[in-house]
């Protein structure tokens, strides 16, 4: 651990002599007020909400897929394989993201990836065999993997270069809020109606974010 930490410091030491790529602008209105004004701009809140929805769904799936598998008597091996498929296809999607971005706009990619993810979440609730669930998760992992980095791109496109650090911070704060709230709601749904209901709830969350994509 110590060796890896020291290795990680090597590029940081080299960066200390580099000049900032964007010159900082003096903030005369205060950080909080500046953040509020930034979020009020057209498209920013919608972009943050899309990011919240996609990141929350990706995290909640990791927790509730094993529970759903247990409820349907999947073997531990099958559950582990399904989780590996989700992670693997998400990673795989990043390899194709550059080519997809060259062919399609950010709006088109976000629109279709969110629709596909929504349909996959609905389908998961009715997948009662490991093979069926694994196939659905394969598609969902890819579509969620496409959507996550695009929300960062969307926030960047909506702001000036001098404001991007604050905009990205606002996006991250939205993600953390979603990662706090959505699992709590998902737990309540699972306790009342089973893990399948969680997937329906996630589909509803993604469906509401589709309208935010269109507004952008």
Task: State where each predicted segment sits.
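Juxtamembrane intracellular "pre-TM" segments in multi-pass secondary transporters
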Residues: 15-48
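Loop-to-transmembrane helix entry/capping segments in MFS-fold secondary transporters
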Residues: 76-77, 161-171
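A membrane-interface helix-boundary motif in multi-pass transporters
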Residues: 1-2, 188-206
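Pair of pore-lining "gating" transmembrane helices in MFS-fold secondary transporters
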Residues: 40-57, 138
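Helix-to-loop junctions at the C-terminal end of transmembrane segments
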Residues: 93-105, 190
